[in-house]
Each structure stands twice: as C-alpha cells, then as structure tokens.
C-alpha cells in the first residue's frame, strides 16, 4: 500500500513565459516565479497582485502594507 502525495505534472514550469487566458488578469503576460504542483497553482510575475498587511516585528517597529503576487490556477495560463 502506497502512502504520501501523488506527484502532479503541470504543462508549465518555473521561468516559462506565459499568458493569462481567463480571470481578472486576462491577457497579461509574465514569467512564472514559483510552481505549486500539489495544488496546481503558479505565481506569475506581475499578475494577481494583492495587498498584504505585514505585522510589526522586532526589527520593524511599524507594520506595513506591501503588494505582491499571489498564486493562480495553472489552467488559467498557457505558454507564449
């Protein structure tokens, strides 16, 4: 009996140039920064940018709001 997580093969990989084919960022192009094969999601440069609220730490006494890319489903992109 096998245990563990099944490896999922995606049609794109890190550093591929892709175009978003559906969603709010449809038509945007970018390079893949990171791939999450288990969840079938990818992070594309300049796509799906959201604001993230950062908590104050010992190094920074004040919190901040930063903008960064969040993952989108791999079926929403195609190689260009």
Curated annotation (Swiss-Prot):
Disulfide bonds: none annotated. Gene3D superfamilies: 2.30.30.30. Coiled coil: none annotated. The keyword Hydrolase does not apply. GO terms for cellular component: ribonucleoprotein complex; ribosome. The keyword Ribonucleoprotein applies. One of its GO terms (biological process) is translation. Keywords: Ribonucleoprotein, Ribosomal protein, RNA-binding, rRNA-binding. One of two assembly initiator proteins, it binds directly to the 5'-end of the 23S rRNA, where it nucleates assembly of the 50S subunit. HAMAP family: Ribosomal_uL24_B. PANTHER family: MITOCHONDRIAL RIBOSOMAL PROTEIN L24. Part of the 50S ribosomal subunit. Belongs to the universal ribosomal protein uL24 family. This is Large ribosomal subunit protein uL24. The lineage of its organism: Bacteria, Pseudomonadati, Chlorobiota, Chlorobiia, Chlorobiales. The gene is rplX.
């Amino acid at each position: 009996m096998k245990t563990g997580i099944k490896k999922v093969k995606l049609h794109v990989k890190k550093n591929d140039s892709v175009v978003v084919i559906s969603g709010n960022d449809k038509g945007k192009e970018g390079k893949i920064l990171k791939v999450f094969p288990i969840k079938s999601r990818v992070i594309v440069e300049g796509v799906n940018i959201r604001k993230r609220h950062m908590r104050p730490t010992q190094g920074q006494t004040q919190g901040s709001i930063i903008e960064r890319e969040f993952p989108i489903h791999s079926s929403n992109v195609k190689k260009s």
